[in-house]
Amino acid sequence: MIYESTRDINRKLNPSEAILQGLSEEGGLFVLRDLGKNKLDLENLIGKSYYEVAEAVLRLFVDFSDEEIKECVEQAYRGKFSHENITPLVELKDGHVLELFNGPTSAFKDVGLSLLPQLTKTALTKVEDKNDILILTATSGDTGKAALEGFKDVDRTKIMVFYPNDGVSTVQKTQMQTQEGKNTKVCAIHGNFDDAQSGIKELFVDEEFKKELLSKNIKLSSANSINIGRLIPQVVYYVVSYLDLVNTNKIKLNDKVNFVVPTGNFGNILAGYYAEQIGLPVNKLICASNNNNVLYDFLTTGVYDKNRDFLKTVSPSMDILISSNLERLLYYVSGCDNDYIAKLMKDLKETGRFEVTGDVLAKIKDKFIAGFADDEQTKETIKAIYEKDNYLLDTHTAVAYKVFLENLDNEHASIVLSTASPYKFTESVYSSLFETQGEDEFTLMNKLHEQTKVVIPENLRDLDKKEIRHKDVINKEDMKKYILEKLGDL
């Protein structure tokens, strides 16, 4: 089992090495060339637990023993999620919602970032690397807190998270600023998420920077979904949700299903593509964007163009113009053509755009449907679904639900991925339903609970009473300097 870079066929690593390195030296992402060679035995997984399905999926992607995989899964999830099924499926009048927000930080990122630290620890022992790992992560709000919580006080790891100072919700910012852990550091930047993500990607290909870290016995890795170890765990809940429909007789085994995914960096929806490649019967993957609809334009025209205004929306975790994981999809639909991918990514870096045509675009359009919702439509959807189903959506899930309603399919069951608790975006959710008088987000959190009786996740209760530990704000150009200065604190 060998991973290679999307941009260079000669850069190859085993799974443990790929998880630890995160990003290839020239900027490519690690992929399995023969993805789909081995398939899941879905029939054998009917009635199995989340843990057992996760183990079956991981066996297709990592070079760990069965015992090591089982230990990773147990350590990641047992007792850490508020629902015994980890990612429960809820039936509404029009379709199903897959709740991915029952983890330690109330966002779907918990699924991947609870398992990644366990994969990292195991990989370190397998490659016998004596260096510590520095996890560098850019966040549009949810990844940061989930990564911090996942790697908090994990031996031989240090983690630094960078977020856009004015580009996350009050709750998301407070979650990160109050983070505990002797190996954690959080810093805001003046800029947007793309600035933070680009800054980190540049450090991964900065040989001088990596040499300086190595002199301190430290190697770089990432907790973003550019790391294959973050992406693989997300494949699991696609399989689990499908099997839930089979187990409850909503579909028969081998019936195809649609998945509707609120999408920013393209990692979550790519996990659905991976699930199909290993045998899951997927009809369409429906990509839902907010007003930063660069992916909608690409999936409908083949032109990817980030040369546009960056818009702040009520769904800030999707406020992204550079969708990193799209590179992995392009690799597969181009027939694993590394040189072609290298050229596309060079065009994107130099001109801010690239275009795909012909067979590549046809393959994408065959599997993907795209739609988007603006802020007004998002808030209208929150209100409509609450009134119709007595169910509370967060802003990102509302974007997906609006796109789902535009693409109703009577021939296939559909699952909408719900990526965050509504309490992470309280002001936007509350004001979709009720009048506000300028209250702060934490006051509105309690009022939303009083009005709807939806339980506030334990990790968000009394969040505003916790000590602020991380107050640093820097210019985006100063990330390298900041990291080297602060390493000694970890």
Where would I find each of the regions flagged by the language model?
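PLP-dependent amino-acid enzyme catalytic core
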Residues: 1-490
